[in-house]
Amino acid sequence: MDEDPSADFTLLINNPVKISENIVGAHLKDFDSCIVLSHLKGHGMGGFGGALKRLSIGFASQAGKAWIHMAEKSKNWREAFQGTNKMDFTSAMGDAASSEYFRNKGGIAFINVMFNISKSCDCAGACAPETKIHDIGILSSTDSVAIDKASIDLVRKTTDSGTMELLQQIQWLEGENTIDVAEQHGIGTQEYNLNRCW
C-alpha cells in the first residue's frame, strides 16, 4: 500500500490523545472495506500486537509508522525507536487505529489468530523467541477493541509457563492503553460476548 512514499496521504484524527493525524499508503484509497488478519503476540514497544496494532501500524506508510512510533515527533524511520514514552506510543496506536476505522466507516472485519503466541514480535528484525503459551484459538469480530480485549483476557486464563511473562510485559509497557484509547475514540467497546462457531 505504500510503495510510492510521495503518494502517502493523511487522515485527520478527531479528539486525539497523542497524534493529530495518521499517514497511510496511497493504495489504501482503493479500498472501502477490508479484513484485518492478525497474529496475536507480544511486542517490545506496545506490549502486544493484535487487531489494533495491525489497524494502526499495519496500515501506516513508512513515514506513518515512524510518526506513530515517535508519537508525532518525526516521520523519519531511522529515528523511530529513539526514546518514545511507552504511554505516548500506545496512545498513538489507539489514535491511528481510529482514523482508519472512521475512513472505512466501520467496514472492517477482524480476525485474531492465537496460535504460537510468543512474548516478542519478529518485526524488530530478529526471530521471535520460543512459544511458551499453548494455542488458544481464533477470534473474529467487527469490533477491533472487543477482539483485542477478548484475546488478552483469554491469554490471562492460560496457565502456561510463558503467560505471566507476556502479561507482565503488557502491563509494564502499558499495552492495554491502546485498547482504552481506541475505545475512547468510539471505534469499539471492551464489553463482549464469546460465541463458538463450531
Label each PLM-derived region with a short phrase:
Residues M1-W198:
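Extended, low-polarity segments enriched in aliphatic/aromatic residues
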